[in-house]
Amino acid sequence: MQFTKIDINNWTRKEYFDHYFGNTPCTYSMTVKLDISKLKKDGKKLYPTLLYGVTTIINRHEEFRTALDENGQVGVFSEMLPCYTVFHKETETFSSIWTEFTADYTEFLQNYQKDIDAFGERMGMSAKPNPPENTFPVSMIPWTSFEGFNLNLKKGYDYLLPIFTFGKYYEEGGKYYIPLSIQVHHAVCDGFHVCRFLDELQDLLNK
């Protein structure tokens, strides 16, 4: 993993970054429903397949890998890894696990299952220790569907990476859908970029 610093003065987004990070800090969220009928038909495991899909598209586009380092310098990670939540029914709490990413779907599922087997029953917010800097958060709320979802973060204006939240899937008109909320920072990611991400994710889920 590499973190390549951005030359702000020669960056095509300098004006937008200065405005939405400094002058008028702005994050926003968008909630859509994804068609997962093909996943259901093929009998694929839902959660790891969604993690694979989201991470695949993130790694295609810099705007979803742009972050601040420990010194506040803007840069781009060469690769992102998913850091996702698992639920503990007995305590009604959750833990976070991160998994190494590979473009090979079968290999990623194996990595995911190894981490679930090793850390899935561990309590505490971070079940798998030492998450690397190049992780992004994903969570699942499988008990309800939703048409809108928003996170209110006290220090959210300094967080540039995307945040993903899935809901409960449902059947409608003979197809299966799942809600997805994506929260981004306007300083690095515009509506165009979010819509392109969602289009590419849906295309991937259709394959």
Swiss-Prot record:
Q: Name one GO molecular function term.
A: chloramphenicol O-acetyltransferase activity
**Gene3D superfamilies referenced in this protein's UniProt entry, alphabetically:** Chloramphenicol acetyltransferase-like domain
Q: What is this protein called?
A: Chloramphenicol acetyltransferase
Single GO BP term: response to antibiotic
In the UniProt entry, which residues are flagged as the active site?
A: H186 (proton acceptor)
UniProt-listed PANTHER family = CHLORAMPHENICOL ACETYLTRANSFERASE, SLR0299 PROTEIN
SMART domains, per database record: CAT
**What keywords tag this UniProt record?**
Acyltransferase, Antibiotic resistance, Plasmid, Transferase
Task: Look up the EC number in the record and give it.
Answer: 2.3.1.28
Identify its protein family.
Belongs to the chloramphenicol acetyltransferase family.
Xref: PROSITE patterns: CAT
Q: Name one Pfam family in it.
A: CAT
- Which source organism? Campylobacter coli
According to its UniProt entry, the function of this protein is described as:
This enzyme is an effector of chloramphenicol resistance in bacteria.
The reaction(s) catalysed by this protein are: chloramphenicol + acetyl-CoA = chloramphenicol 3-acetate + CoA
Self-association and partners: Homotrimer.
